[in-house]
Amino acid sequence: MSTFIGQLVGFAAIVFLVVRYVVPPVRRLMAARQEAVRQQLQDAAAAADRLTESTTAHSKAVEAAKAESKRVVDEAQADAKRITEQLAAQAGLEAERIKSQGSRQVDLLRTQLTRQLRLELGHEAVRQAGELVRNYVADPAQQSATVDRFLDDLDAMAPAAADVQYPLMTKMRSSSRVALVNLTERFTTVAKDLDNKALSALSSELVSVAQMLDREIVVTRYLTVPAEDAGPRVRLIERLLSGKVGDVTLEVLRAAVSERWSANSDLIDALEHLSRQALLEVAERENKVDEVEEQLFRFSRILDVQPRLAILLGDYAVPVEGRVGLLRKVLDSASITVNPIVAALLTQTVELLRGRPAEEAVQFLAEVAVARRGEVVAQVSAAADLSDAQRSRLTEVLSRIYGHPVSVQLQIDTELLGGLLIAVADEVIDGTLASRLAAAEAQLPD
């Protein structure tokens, strides 16, 4: 009995412990589990609803996509049809354009080929004509005949006279031309009483004064002031040069500064002109004028064919002494004996270039030498040397054309083939066979 009661009490204690400590946690666990199951059921219901909604939305999207795809297909078909029509129209226009352009190209090529054929035929004709002319003028008699025919044509021009002025006069205005005439007359009066040595000294001193005036621009400007009273200018030149130059030179300088000059450089040109006239007067007294003229023109032609020499003689980076030294070396190495007057004239020209090309200055000097005798220079180029009769006839015809005695300076150029090329001052008469062939070729179509 006591055992039973003890067991009962133990059982009761166990039940109490279970109820007190085990049952509450189990209840809470069961409640939590129930709540979780209930939440899961709610979530499942919501998921089912969302599934239903997504199924409905998918169906609607599929229907919309089908409608959109049908619309896109319809639009694409319409665009394709329109593009096809446009391409067909453009293809037709392009075909017409290509056809028209092709026709124009054919016409252009035909025209070009025709022009090219004409050009080639023209050049061939000119070439053949040139060969015929060269074969024809290979005979000296026939070549001489071309000169005679040109002289016949030139003879017909004789009534048309041209006015050719003295070389230096063409560079000056009216006041300077009058001054140069007066100064030249004064120089002529003074020079006739001087011997050759005095004339040479006068020439040298005038060149020295011209060089000084070229350097001293202020002095030159004062000496050419166009004032009525020439006294101040005369007194200045006397103060500057009295005792440094000869009396004759000083007298000429007084006369020079007493004149009215249009430009400062005209006074220097006039002094250079008088220095040349002094040397040419010496040549005339020694009967060397023809030799001087010939050698001057020969040196001028040398400068034409030797441009490097002309450049060196006119190189202002080199002192004038160096350029004069080069000139003397060239003259000393010449195959002929150079006249001392020619050497002096060329030296003075190099010393007083004053910006002019050497070849132009020497050519001008040669023309001055000829003009002293009242002659006009005619530069004549021929394929062969002229006979004495042809040279005389040419001189006579040109003298009648220009109304002045003419000095013919002949230059041989075999490339001219026949006829003559004549240059007087700025006027050129070209009657060469080479120029006629060139003119015929120039008239060919491009």
Curated annotation (Swiss-Prot):
Highest taxon of the lineage: Bacteria
Main location: membrane
Keyword Transmembrane assigned: yes
Membrane-spanning parts: 4-24
Record-stated family: In the N-terminal section; belongs to the ATPase B chain family.
UniProt xrefs under NCBIfam families: ATP_synt_b, PRK13428.1, PRK13430.1
Protein's name in the database: ATP synthase subunit b-delta
Native organism: Mycolicibacterium paratuberculosis (strain ATCC BAA-968 / K-10)
